């Protein structure tokens, strides 16, 4: 459960991304594909090379979804319902992949926002991403 301090940290962190959300989302995806090659199986039709338009486009989708979740942190199930349906019923993404992407997002944010990535912010973002992952996998059951 996200505390009031966690929610404040999450919202502040997402505001600090500014116009870089899409680039950071793409970088996190690229990190995931390089570190965990089995995750590429869900993207057989994508050009996964560095800087590809498809990678950038999906990075933007990830960043936009997380920005929406951060803006609606008090109602994650409502904010992510359509994405949960998509990933569970149509795409059938293995739930472990959400944890892998969450880890890569944390690494990316830490690399780009080192002064802001305090232990408290790290913990808050980790809890937030775990909550997002839980919601996204809730319809698998």
UniProtKB/Swiss-Prot annotation:
UniProt binding sites for O2: 58
PTM sites of type N6-acetyllysine: 16
Modified sites of kind N6-succinyllysine: 7, 11, 16, 40
GO biological process, one term: hydrogen peroxide catabolic process
Annotated heme b binding sites: 87
Cellular component terms (Gene Ontology): blood microparticle; haptoglobin-hemoglobin complex; hemoglobin complex
A GO term for molecular function: organic acid binding
Modified residues (Phosphoserine): 3, 35, 49, 102, 124, 131, 138
Distribution of this protein across tissues and organs: Red blood cells.
Domain Globin: 1-141
Keywords for the protein's UniProt record, in alphabetical order: Acetylation, Heme, Iron, Metal-binding, Oxygen transport, Phosphoprotein, Transport
Matching SUPFAM superfamilies: Globin-like
Record-linked InterPro entries: Globin, Globin-like_sf, Globin/Proto, Hemoglobin_a-typ, Hemoglobin_oxygen_transport, Hemoglobin_pi
Positions where Phosphothreonine occurs in the chain: 8, 108, 134, 137
Source taxon at top rank: Eukaryota
Modified residues (Phosphotyrosine): 24
Subunit structure, interactors included: Heterotetramer of two alpha chains and two beta chains.
Described function: Involved in oxygen transport from the lung to the various peripheral tissues.
Family statement: Belongs to the globin family.
Entry protein name: Hemoglobin subunit alpha
